[in-house]
Amino acid sequence: MTTTKVNHKRAVLRLRPGQFVVTPAIERVAIRALRYLKSGFPVHLRGPAGTGKTTLAMHLANCLDRPVMLLFGDDQFKSSDLIGSESGYTHKKVLDNYIHSVVKLEDEFKQNWVDSRLTLACREGFTLVYDEFNRSRPEVNNVLLSALEEKILSLPPSSNQPEYLSVNPQFRVIFTSNPEEYAGVHSTQDALMDRLVTISMPEPDEITQTEILIQKTNIDRESANFIVRLVKSFRLATGAEKTSGLRSCLMIAKVCADNNIPVTTESLDFPDIAIDILFNRSHLSMSESTNIFLELLDKFSAEELEILNNRVTGDNDFLIDNSQFVSQQLAGQPN
C-alpha cells in the first residue's frame, strides 16, 4: 500500500494486492459487495469487531482500481472534517507607480479553501473507505445524504469556490460499522441507512480462520486449526461472543510461530500465551476462567491422544495387512 500526493497535498492510498485470504465464504460476500459498488451503490459492512470488515473494505477498494481515501469515524468530527474548511490567508499587495505623480495601492487578503477527504473523493472520483462511520455523530454525516442520492455535495459559502459540487460518476463509498451496543458508537440516522446496501459480516468460519492464520503467521495447518478450535471453545464456554475470536487467534498464532513454541497441550509455554490473550476478553473472574480453560485443555489433550492412538492403530493394521499380503505372495511362489 502506497500513498500519493494530490490536490492540496491530501494523501490518497494506492493499494497493492496483499495477503488477502479468499475462501468460499469470503468470496461470496466480496462478489455481492462488488456488484452493488459497480452499480453505483454505497456498501455498508456491519458486524462485531474482529470479523474482517476493514480488511474486506480495503480489498473491495483495491478491486475497484481507483485511488482510495481512508477516513476513520470520530466523535469529535465536525462537518468541516469531511468536506473541508478555509485555512490560512493569501496576502496580495500591488503598488503601481507607473505614472510617477500617481501611486496606486491594492492590498488584498483572501482565505484559502482546503478540501477534506470527502470533497476530494467526490471531485476526483476516488473510493472513500469510511471506517467505523457510526463513531461520528449523526448530524456530521448528514453531508453524505445529498452526495449519495442527488450526487451533489453542498459546500459552505466561500468566495473561492461554488457552493455546490457535482459528484464524479466514479465516486464510491464503502462504510464499516460496529454494533450500536459498543461503547462510543452512535445510532445511525434512517435517512443515511436507507441509502446504503448493508451486508452483515458474520463470524468467520473455522476454515476461513485457519487459512488466515496460515497465511498471516506462517504457522502450520494443524497448529492453526488447534488454536481456532481452542479459542472458539473458550469463547463459547465463557459467553464472550460480543467480539470475534479471530484477533485472539492471530495473536496466539503469531507469538507461537515467531518464538517456535509448540502448539500442544503438553507445551509449558503455550497455555501461558493463551491465558494472557484470552482471559482479558472474558467477563468472568480469573478463577472461573482458569477452571474453564483447564477443562478445555484436558478435553483437547484427550482428543489429541485419541487421534494419535487411531493413527498408530491404523499404521499397525496396515503393517499387518501388508505382512499377510507378502506372506501370501511368498507362499504362492514355486520352490
UniProtKB/Swiss-Prot annotation:
Keyword Hydrolase in record: yes
- What's its top-level EC category? hydrolase
The cellular location(s) given in this protein's UniProt record come to:
Gas vesicle; Cytoplasm
Residues that, per the record, bind ATP: 47-54
**Which UniProt key words apply to this protein?**
ATP-binding, Cytoplasm, Gas vesicle, Hydrolase, Nucleotide-binding
GO CC terms for this protein?
A: cytoplasm; gas vesicle; preribosome, large subunit precursor
Which EC number(s) does the record attach to this protein?
A: 3.6.4.-
One Gene Ontology term from the biological process aspect of the record: ribosomal large subunit assembly
ATP-binding keyword on record? yes
A GO molecular function assigned to this protein is: ATP hydrolysis activity
Recorded catalytic reaction(s): these are: ATP + H2O = ADP + phosphate + H(+)
Q: Which Pfam families does the protein's record reference?
A: AAA_5
Give the protein's biological function.
An ATPase that functions in gas vesicle formation. A minor component of the gas vesicle, also found in soluble extracts. Gas vesicles (GV) are hollow, gas filled proteinaceous nanostructures. During planktonic growth they allow positioning of the organism at a favorable depth for light or nutrient acquisition.
Quaternary data? Forms homodimers, probably interacts with other GV proteins including GvpA.
Family statement: Belongs to the CbbQ/NirQ/NorQ/GpvN family.
Q: What is this protein called?
A: Gas vesicle ATPase GvpN
Source species:
Dolichospermum flosaquae (Anabaena flos-aquae)
